[in-house]
Amino acid sequence: REIKAIAKNRQATLVSYSIIENKQGEESQLYVWVVNAEGKINFRQLDLIEIKQKFRTSVASVSRNSLQAAAGGLDLRNPRLQDYIVSFRGDLRAKSENYRRKLGFPRDAYKMLITPIKDLLPQDPEELVVFIPQGSLFLVPFPALQNSAGEFLIEQHTLQLSPSIQTLGMKQPAAIDSSQALIVGNPAPMPDSLSQLSGAEAEAKAIAKILGTTAIIGEAATETTAIARMQEAKLIHLATHGLFDEHQGLQSSLAFSTRDNQDGFLTAEEILDLDLAADLVVLSACNTGRGKITGDGVVGLSRSFLLAGAQSTMVSLWYVPDLATSALMTDFYQQLQGDLSQPQALRRAMLNTMETYPSPREWAAFVLVGQ
């Protein structure tokens, strides 16, 4: 009853994936629940053993570099699937003029995760589809998945991720109050000799101009200053280095200035101690959606911000390129100045960025997670 009410109140289609084991402890079934915006529940059941056999060749064809990951088949909770997905993200990072023709994984993943439920998804691309994955599936870059015609999923639908049904809540997200924005870019000096990010500084200044505020840049961008401002902000945008720890997710961190002998790292564990009221936290940094994989998602920066009180986060799944990321982010905030929702604004920004930077490595890294 709750999931039906949430779907109706949010006017969204909810897609929940659940992996079922047999008596031998093997992943044997993939259960998929789809709840449309009218509250109607549909259920699809997929045979994972059959899927393993069907996609083994396709997985191997992704690239020679993913052969080792593919050798384990599609065991959806085997740690090797994380390597498999990482290899796909690696392929996205590698520029290729023949991307749509050569890269097999996004089409295989589309066939596995989207095709069985495609008839249940909304026809209007502006209508929201919220994916609620399990385990390593949380790292699948859904916007970059492709159908047989080479069309990306983000071209077909407005997308968002959520760790759980409960995270979505019953209410529509409130409009972001950009008058209480914290914008940070290119802290200096960086800890551990991390490189300065001139593109992140330009990005922060451009976004601050759109929002009518001033960005915190360079030596002013200390961890102490950021924490103090975060707890008052309704919108937080952090353009800096992100470091993830896939073994101890709570040690994933964001880099800030080391001025005044500060260590310069704000960890996911430290974020849990904050009391936030932000409608949106944007982590414009590398790998901010990564962390330790568990059965119910990723333990890392995104989850910590949500648990600390943020309504939504925007995070990345791989090393993001400077210029394309700056273009995507500034476009996203420009789109938000209208009456678009956060997922709609991100979709528009991705489609616009795609025109200048056609490779998915440039535009598909970021996902919205949360309410």
Predicted feature locations:
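Residue-level detector of buried hydrophobic side-chain packing
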Residues: 15, 32, 129-131, 184, ...
